[in-house]
Amino acid sequence: AEKIKICLQKQANSSFSLHNGFGGNLYATEEKRMFELVKPKAGASVLNQSTWIGFGDSRTDKSNSAFPRSADVSAKTADKFRSLSGGSLMLSMFGPPGKVDYLYQGCGKHKVFYEGVNWSPHAAIDCYRKNWTDIKLNFQKNIYELASQSHCMSLVNALDKTIPLQVTAEVAKNCNNSFLKNPALYTQEVNPSKQICGEENLAFFTLPTQFGTYECKLHLVASCYFIYDSKEVYNKRGCDNYFQVIYDSSGKVVGGLDNRVSPYTGNTGDTPTMQCDMLQLKPGRYSVRSSPRFLLMPERSYCFDMKEKGLVTAVQSVWGKGRKSDYAVDQACLSTPGCMLIQKQKPYIGEADDHHGDQEMRELLSGLDYEARCISQSGWVNETSPFTEEYLLPPKFGRCPLAAKEESIPKIPDGLLIPTSGTDTTVTKPKSRIFGNDDLIIGLLFVAIVETGIGGYLLGSRKESGGGVTKESAEKGFEKIGNDIQILRSSTNIAIEKLNDRITHDEQAIRDLTLEIENARSEALLGELGIIRALLVGNISIGLQESLWELASEITNRAGDLAVEVSPGCWIIDNNICDQSCQNFIFKFNETAPVPTIPPLDTKIDLQSDPFYWGSSLGLAITTPISLAALAISGIAICRTK
């Protein structure tokens, strides 16, 4: 009889890289980073498709006869907008003659505003004021501020009011021989023979607690009044000074102008200018007192429920070629905390006409069709990686990646993996070992780690005996990683406390502080991932060792009396009794069917943070199955000795 010795052959060479882990090491033919850097996409997006609403005009109006060529959004996104061609929130607030008057109202956690262009210099609205841009800026700023604190908002287009009997509604030549719907202009006829100066006007209006189905906790009201250069310009008959003042129910002045105590401008001119201040007022009854000749009466408001903090996105709204625009929307958003501004980089070039259907704007708003993990001033991200190459500019909400250098992200083994025995003394040793301490044993094992992300933790052995990770080992591993993470976070908190001392009212200092805090978070997370990587490598190593032990046991069982295991991973076989086909059956069975080993694991690592939080709070969670694939033997290298 001719006896030969068949062993599993060691296959490591200089092309392999060594990966040290907690509880075991690996040699691997390849390696990859635990996460890749992501790049934000420019433009707007939302965190949740079911909780946002838009307010727009013809560029989001699905009922426009030229839709979809006239639109800057998809049909799906247009359904989310409250829009009417020719409309704008400010037009509906003031109601200038001949302009679209649309009842804007709706509810959403995230509000997207793409409107404003219909009240711009091109509209040439006068009504005692040729340039309304500063009023528009103040109006839009207040809208964005209140919208960010409310779930629902609505135009209230008819306030209850009481006006004095001696006044009548009036029109103005410089307002298309009409006047604004809000404020309404009332005048008092003065009979010089009886009463030269007339009577002081006293009027009342009520801000409701509810308008239709919309609750009103706060109203945005336009407090409008005339500005005169001098008393003589106001009243050439020598009557008293001009005043128009709003009082709350307690008699406190909340808005207006009183030239009895405030000086006139002192400029030269004989035509008054109308000024409108934006007031945030609670529901209730208010009084208006004015000098006899004119009364400007609030008739409308925007109502907000103030029920929850939310997100606001404002989209730059400008005309195309040949029409003059303003940039009040841009300036209002930039001066409102938490408002994200979407801006074009090129002139507006429409498809339907010069002013409707711009390709760049369509690209910037295409993200509204999707849900993002993070939205920011820098753009939106829907990839799961926690890292981006550049710092995302605030405001930002959701699970936002942190800035990191690619080389700082830990690498994990990939491709062909070879385990070493490791040093975790709490791991049960296989009854029949095919490896010695720090030896390399291989049956050409291949493990695939699929999806973007990392394979994860092996949380325990399926066998009560044999190799693998014991409960005690896993507990000790997680105790170690937990302690190390707490140390990292404690160090981060100490650094943040030191930075707190540097906070000032200077905006740049606050921005610098925010950046430093994010950098500290990024460094802490990278440290945490380093610990996770070490535990991951160790547990994969132990799992592979168990797989090899199972392979050796399977070979011994298949061989029966035909082969005798003389040492770990080596068998003596009688060549005359077991020919080549017999040996192939024993040693090469895996070419037709892989050896069942470790099942898929629930081990995906994800970053957790509170939605709508400025920045990302760091927390690690093990979530859905990611698929450390079952180990399949791809081939056994056999060495034979006689």
From Swiss-Prot:
Glycosylation sites: 13, 48, 131, 382
Catalytic activity entry: N-acetyl-9-O-acetylneuraminate + H2O = N-acetylneuraminate + acetate + H(+); N-acetyl-4-O-acetylneuraminate + H2O = N-acetylneuraminate + acetate + H(+)
EC number: 3.1.1.53
A GO CC annotation given for this chain: host cell plasma membrane
Chain intervals for the UniProt region annotation (N-acetyl-9-O-acetylneuraminic acid binding): 138-297
Subunit-structure text: Homotrimer of disulfide-linked HEF1-HEF2.
Name of the protein in question: Hemagglutinin-esterase-fusion glycoprotein
Species assigned in the record: Influenza C virus (strain C/Great lakes/1167/1954)
